[in-house]
Structure formats: C-alpha cells, structure tokens
Amino acid sequence: MVQEYDVIVIGAGHAGVEAGLASARRGAKTLMLTINLDNIAFMPCNPSVGGPAKGIVVREIDALGGQMAKTIDKTHIQMRMLNTGKGPAVRALRAQADKVLYQQEMKRVIEDEENLHIMQGMVDELIIEDNEVKGVRTNIGTEYLSKAVIITTGTFLRGEIILGNMKYSSGPNHQLPSITLSDNLRELGFDIVRFKTGTPPRVNSKTIDYSKTEIQPGDDVGRAFSFETTEYILDQLPCWLTYTNAETHKVIDDNLHLSAMYSGMIKGTGPRYCPSIEDKFVRFNDKPRHQLFLEPEGRNTNEVYVQGLSTSLPEHVQRQMLETIPGLEKADMMRAGYAIEYDAIVPTQLWPTLETKMIKNLYTAGQINGTSGYEEAAGQGLMAGINAAGKVLNTGEKILSRSDAYIGVLIDDLVTKGTNEPYRLLTSRAEYRLLLRHDNADLRLTDMGYELGMISEERYARFNEKRQQIDAEIKRLSDIRIKPNEHTQAIIEQHGGSRLKDGILAIDLLRRPEMTYDIILELLEEEHQLNADVEEQVEIQTKYEGYINKSLQQVEKVKRMEEKKIPEDLDYSKIDSLATEAREKLSEVKPLNIAQASRISGVNPADISILLIYLEQGKLQRVSD
C-alpha cells in the first residue's frame, strides 16, 4: 500500500528539521526522510550556533515558532554576547554547542512532534506529473505520495570529499552521498552549480598545552536565544585562542602544491568568508599570523575543533602544521580536516516562497540553495515548511520582507540576485539593520508566528503583556519631569552628564548618550519593577527613536513599490524599450513586484521607469477594454 502525506521533507539537517517541524505544526501530515536517523541535526563543521547576523536569525526562527533556539539553549556549553561595545544593531549571541546533545535533543523533539513521521531512506527520484510534484521514490523502489515536497539535502548532493590528491564520493563526515537525486534534478532541467566547503582537523583535548593559549570564557550571566527560555546554563566550558606563525606558514608554502585548492582537483567555488588556511595564506600573505579558536565539541568528548584551520592539505601536512602552533605542538589529531564539493541549484529558479518555478509544489531549502551555515539553512527550512503546509492546506503562505527579518534579506538575496559562491549572511547585507536587531526579534515577528499557527496562546499572551509594559513605561517617562535640584544635579554629574538648566522630561533625559534607564530610576528614586528585556526595549527605542523613524520612512517607500505587482506571466521580450540585459534578468528572476525588480543586478532605474510605464499602460488598456 502506497503511503500518502501532505508534505514530504527530504533530509533531516538544520533546514530539514525546521521544515518538518513547521509543516507539522501548521497541521500538515508530514514525512521526513533521511539517509541516517542517527545523524539528525548533525553538525559536520563548527560546533556552534549564532554569531553576527546569524544569531539574530536564530532569534527570528524562535519568534516565528521554530526550534533551533530552544534546542541550543538546552545543549550549549558556552554562550557569549558579541559586539557589546557597539550599537544594538550589530549585537548578536553566539553559543558553543555540545554537538551530540544538540543532535539527541533535536531528535527527541522531532520524534515527539504530532503529525511528523520519520523514516530512514534515500530518495533517488521525484515523482512528477504535468510539472507538479506528486511524491518521491527511494533507492529501494519505495514510493511515498504527497501534495508537496521540500528538498533539504545540504552538502549530500553528489558530495565528494577531497584530501590532498585523494577524492571520493561522500557526504559530510564520510556519510553516504546522494548521487541519483542530483541526476534527477538535472534531468528535470534545473540549473545546477558546484560549490565547495571545508572543515579543520579535530585534536584531543588531553594533548593540548593550554598554558600557551588565551582563555575565552563565556558570559557570566544567563543568556538565551529563545524568548521562552527561563532556565540558564551557567556551568560553561571555555574556548581558547592561539595563532599560526611563520613556521606554520612555511609548512603551508612548502606543501601548497599538494593542496586540492591549488592543484586543480577542486572545481567548486568555496566560501569567501570562511576560507581554508591555505587560501588565507595565499590571499593575505602580508599577515604574520591568523587566529585559531580551540572549541570543545561537547562535555563528554575530548575532541576539540580547531576553528580557522579548515584545510584540504594531506593528513601528514596537517600534522606538521599542528606541530608549529603554540599549545598544539604535541596535540594528537583525532580527525583530519577535508574539503567537500557538492551540487546546489541556482536559487533564482525559486519564488520568494522557496517553491521552484519549474515544478509546482516543490520547495528547496538550505545549502542546496547555495547558502552556507546552519542558521541560514534553518531559517530557509522554517519558511519552506510554513509555505508548503500553507499551500497544500490552503491556510496561506508567507514571504518575509527585507524590513521584516534577516531571513527575509537572505531569501530575497538568493531568489533575486542569486549567488556565485556559498552565501553567508552578514549585517552589511541588510539596509534596515537598526530595525532588525537581536533584542526586538519577538516584537517584529511574534504576531506573524501567531497568525501562522506556530505560537501558542500562552506564549502570545506573555508577549502581549511585554509589549504593553514597554509602551506603558515609555508613556510614563514621557509624563514625568525631572527638576534640577541638588540631588539630580549630583547624580547627573556623577555619570558624566552636564547640569540641568531647567526641568526636563525623563524620556528626553534618557535620550542623552551618557544616560541609561538605571540612572533614570536612580534620579526618580525608584526600584526596578520591570523585566530586564522590557527595560532594554524602553532604552533602545527611546535613544534610537530618530534613526528608527528614518528607517521606517524608507521602509514605507519600498512598501509602496512592493504594492506595484508584476504579473507572473509577463512577457518581457515584448517591452522593446528595456535594455537587453534587463530583459534577460527580469525574464529569469520573474520578480513579483517593482521593489524586487529594482534589486536585480543588471536592472537599472531607467529600466524600472520603462517597466512602470508599461504596467500602467496595461492597466489603462484593460480598463478601456
């Protein structure tokens, strides 16, 4: 008997688990197929979650009802807030994961999720009828039927591991690769590219001389990614910092001809922002040293991840490199680093919902779309799961805008501009980063998560209470006047402020750079009554109000452009005045509105003006008809 589902998810990595959970939580009967049930949510590369921009994505996933934040909060070994000396727009949380515990916890969550069924199996082929996906067929001939399919295959598609002059078929960490499915996508007509990533060696902690390294402890206060987390892990493990040196660089230089990067063996394009150590040596040969972070892979293992030493050099050369690094001179290498090449689809073949333009009800998410990183994959998986379930159940799809979330920036960049290298999310990619902060992800997205059925009534009630407290406190401070008496003058001067000449509203005093919410309470002789996150919002929203309002005005302009819709079936070849490049790019991307069209590389303002005139003439023609 053939089994039938609403949604099938191929793969159970970081994109797959979020896709499967989101689909099931929206009420779709969902099947998740994975090559190995023991490797659900596996971390084949760095054992960490978060960091600049990426940490904000994890918060956004949580605000929309996803899982990554909750799981890392329960399984991390260290957590740090980054960029605390900078403005709120670039602050981000980063956690070191216990990679085994993370896997185990995520597997437990998936197994317990209602509507989500899990099966070990390798998908070889999509079942397609009239350009619409109808299900999948495995390598042993089993068929599963469904109304939608989400492909989240990571680096498994025609994966090949490269080490020195050796190259062999493999998924990450020497797992089985998926070869036939990649062939099937080519046969269906998808444009496929070849990308590359890599990983460093792991060493035995017992053989590291930590006295020659610099300790990197976690924060000594409770931190969490999830807005629902109330219990914090304070028993943390440190990371350690060391550096390469002239000796290390000589080993690389002497053996560069053995690197697959420079021998011509690697054909795929590697990640710009996570280069191998040999690539760093060649590209930045003026630098006398490069940072290396020694990151424990968990509480119950001695394996330490040497971040910054990603390499495809032969194993014996990797040992020689380690012997030159302070603290690692006698380190026992437990796993060698390697490079991995894999197939990815050109992401401009997708709609902003992550549904493919070529095959109806077929979605893709994660590294198959040309991205790098667990967080980028998880964000895409979440949206693909939300949209696939929404489409088949007729409960609505959702497209995040660039002003809604970093996830929106990520997906818009992929489907509008494409990428010729593994895409990494950066704060600099977001034009509204003051709006897309770590601290306000819930204020931006919880309403949306609730409307999509991803947020519980209890959580939504708590969120609304928080929002009301923020608004009420800002209003209260706007009604209180602080008088320039000796008490207030002394406190203000003590904190580096200038004396008051006249009375001032508490909210206006808080806008001064040297003032904080704590100081305002001191001036008012009041105790703390609100939660720290409410107080933080009051301070940030007050201090940055002018800048935030300017950003919101820019958002409104873009929204007006987004309201100018473009028909999906518009034939750009009939618009004679368009430049040839613009016509080709617009035909390829098929933008949904003028705002998206304006972001396509090769489409200039003159082309947009021509397109607007053409659309307006079309409307007038329809009215006259």
UniProtKB/Swiss-Prot annotation:
Source organism superkingdom: Bacteria
GO biological process: tRNA methylation; tRNA wobble uridine modification
Cofactor dependence: FAD
GO cellular component: cytosol
Residues bound to NAD(+): 270-284
Family matches, as Gene3D superfamilies: FAD/NAD(P)-binding domain (3.50.50.60), GidA associated domain, C-terminal subdomain (1.10.150.570), tRNA uridine 5-carboxymethylaminomethyl modification enzyme MnmG/GidA (1.10.10.1800)
Annotated localization: Cytoplasm
Keyword Flavoprotein: yes
SMART domains: GIDA_assoc_3
Sorted UniProt keywords: Cytoplasm, FAD, Flavoprotein, NAD, tRNA processing
An MF annotation (GO) of this entry: flavin adenine dinucleotide binding
Classification via InterPro entries: FAD/NAD-bd_sf, GIDA_C_N, MnmG, MnmG-rel, MnmG-rel_CS, MnmG_C, MnmG_C_subdom, MnmG_C_subdom_sf
Keyword Transferase tagged: no
Binding site for FAD: G11, A12, G13, H14, A15, G16, V123, S178, Q367
Chain's role: NAD-binding protein involved in the addition of a carboxymethylaminomethyl (cmnm) group at the wobble position (U34) of certain tRNAs, forming tRNA-cmnm(5)s(2)U34.
HAMAP family: MnmG_GidA
Family, as annotated: Belongs to the MnmG family.
UniProt subunit comment: Homodimer. Heterotetramer of two MnmE and two MnmG subunits.
Name recorded for this polypeptide: tRNA uridine 5-carboxymethylaminomethyl modification enzyme MnmG
Species this chain originates from: Staphylococcus aureus (strain NCTC 8325 / PS 47)
